A protein has these predicted regions:
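N-terminal secretory signal peptides that target proteins for export/translocation
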Residues: 1-19
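Aromatic (phenylalanine/tyrosine) cluster motif
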Residues: 14, 25-27
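Hydrophobic h-region of N-terminal signal peptides that target proteins for export
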Residues: 27-35
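Acidic, metal/ion-coordinating pockets
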Residues: 35-289
């Protein structure tokens, strides 16, 4: 059993350019129990990559020449050599934004994510842009789980392809990971998400997090595509979630921000902007009885 005697969270943002910038932020969550064994894991996060296969190409843009899958893949390869206990997640909207997506409808993005060894992703609203059948095609190609707990997909072709959550048994720990998607109304054309039933993310999160806790998860991670404002509400009205990795609002945070959950406990929320320019890093230190 693992107790969160303390969780030390560090966010390193690596900018996609030669001579990467490193910004370090540290905070502690108060002790809950006496530890006998310490375990450290690193969580890496991307979100709202929007098909940015190549670096930014618009001259005059402050991010010109940054981002791109090659830079990210190179960084990940080197990072894993130096840090063996790493989990890699994406918070949705891998789709839409360049001709690669228009031509290949997401296949390039998913295959590259397979090569980079992603551990899980959740669904962004732009994943629906070519409809449910295309989503099913892509998720079958994925060598990583796709999780979304607040979309009822039983009446769609995604029924057996998307899970509410997964439990990853890594590094001697059980890591519970669940996803949350944005409300389709106003974001997704009705004919592109027919049969998808949106459910309240707060109610669903409390249910799933409690279930993951009962299943003995040492860490519970939420992959959210709700946007920063909804993530703030999510924290304030839930319990048992240890980390929220967010997307959708294209918010770049220079470090994780702590919010109090319904029990008054700190929960770090992390957003890493858009276009794959940044990779977020969160270091967790857990103490096991």
């Amino acid at each position: 059993m693992t107790t969160h005697n303390h969780i030390t969270s560090v966010l390193n943002i690596f900018k996609g350019r030669t001579g990467k910038r490193l910004m370090l932020f540290l905070f502690l969550i108060p002790a809950l129990a006496i530890a006998q064994e310490t375990k450290k894991i690193i969580i890496l996060q991307t979100s709202d990559v929007h098909s940015r296969i190549e670096p930014m190409t618009q001259e005059g843009d402050r991010n010109y020449g940054q981002g791109g899958f090659v830079r990210r893949a190179t960084f990940l390869q080197q990072f894993r050599k130096e840090n063996p206990d790493v989990l890699l997640f994406d918070c949705g909207d891998i789709s839409q934004g360049t001709p690669y997506y228009n031509m290949f409808k997401g296949e390039v993005e998913v295959n590259l994510m397979n090569e980079m060894g992603y551990d899980a992703m959740t669904i962004g609203n732009h994943e629906f842009d070519f409809g449910l059948d295309n989503m099913a095609r892509l998720f079958k190609l994925a060598k990583f789980p796709v999780v979304c707990a607040n979309y009822d997909l039983d009446a769609t072709v995604l029924k057996d392809l998307v899970k509410p959550y997964v439990i990853l048994e890594r590094f001697g720990l059980k890591v519970g990971v669940f996803g949350l998607g944005a409300k389709p109304e106003g974001l997704i054309q009705a004919n592109k998400c027919e049969g998808v039933i949106y459910q309240d993310p707060i109610a669903v999160s409390n249910e799933i997090a409690e279930q993951l806790k009962e299943e003995g998860c040492d860490v519970i991670v939420c992959l959210s595509h709700l946007g920063i404002q909804m993530d703030e509400k999510l924290v304030a009205n839930t319990r048992n979630i240890d980390v929220i990795l967010g997307g959708h609002s294209h918010t770049f945070m220079e470090g994780p921000k702590n919010y109090l959950n319904i029990d008054g406990k700190n929960v770090p929320v992390m957003h890493t902007g858009k276009n794959g320019i940044y990779v977020g890093r969160l270091d967790l230190t857990l103490n096991k009885k």
